[in-house]
Structure formats: structure tokens, C-alpha cells
Curated annotation (Swiss-Prot):
Gene3D superfamilies: Ribosomal protein S11. This is Small ribosomal subunit protein uS11. Located on the platform of the 30S subunit, it bridges several disparate RNA helices of the 16S rRNA. Forms part of the Shine-Dalgarno cleft in the 70S ribosome. It comes from Yersinia pestis (strain Pestoides F). Part of the 30S ribosomal subunit. Interacts with proteins S7 and S18. Binds to IF-3. The keyword rRNA-binding applies. One of its GO terms (molecular function) is structural constituent of ribosome. InterPro entries: Ribosomal_uS11 (IPR001971), Ribosomal_uS11_bac-type (IPR019981), Ribosomal_uS11_CS (IPR018102), Ribosomal_uS11_sf (IPR036967). PROSITE patterns: RIBOSOMAL_S11. Belongs to the universal ribosomal protein uS11 family. The gene is rpsK. It comes from the Bacteria. The keyword RNA-binding applies.
Amino acid sequence: MAKAPIRARKRVRKTVSDGVAHIHASFNNTIVTITDRQGNALGWATAGGSGFRGSRKSTPFAAQVAAERCAEAVKEYGIKNLEVMVKGPGPGRESTIRALNAAGFRITNITDVTPIPHNGCRPPKKRRV
């Protein structure tokens, strides 16, 4: 019995005017995710996935490259305005925001959402190098 030909469904791209850029800047890496207002991820990039390895992964330049790659990934959605949420103490906080601004997005507001414990868990011991 002959099988019916399988047709690929056309993916309909939705257009989003406003988005939210979530920047997670740790000491080791920087993760940039751009979502719509509801939180559905439209595109993401990391410093490690952008070709940086080891200690170069935790540099402001690596975070800038990750932000540029993430901006390219979401250009097709037609995002014009971005709300930026920054989490973490890493070195890529500021350079990521500058790169998103240079990519042509209008940044409406910047929010720091770094989790701060109200004296919760004990922090790790100090490094002795």
C-alpha cells in the first residue's frame, strides 16, 4: 500500500513589537534570552556557545558577542522595544546591554532581578588561591 506524501507544515512567524531580554551574568558565563511579554522564548545565545571557552567565556567581550548573536536570532520577529532584566554579578552585565542597544533595539527600562537571600543558605567558603 502506498503511503501518502508527507507535507511539511508552514511555520507561521509571529510578529512581536515588544520583548524582554533576560540576561543571566554569572562569574563563568553569560546567557542572553529574548522572550515576548508572556515569557515565551524567541531566541537565546550564550558566551560559551559563541565560541568562547575557559576563562575567555567570562569576559565582557564574550557577553557582547552573545548579545549580538541573540539579537540576530530574533530580528525576524520584528522586535523594536526591549525591556532588560539583569540577573547575577558577572562581568557581562553592562556590555550585554550596550550590545543590545547597538543592535537597534530601543531599551525601555532596565531591571535588576538578582536574587538576594534574606539570610538563607550559607554561602560557599572563601577561595584560597
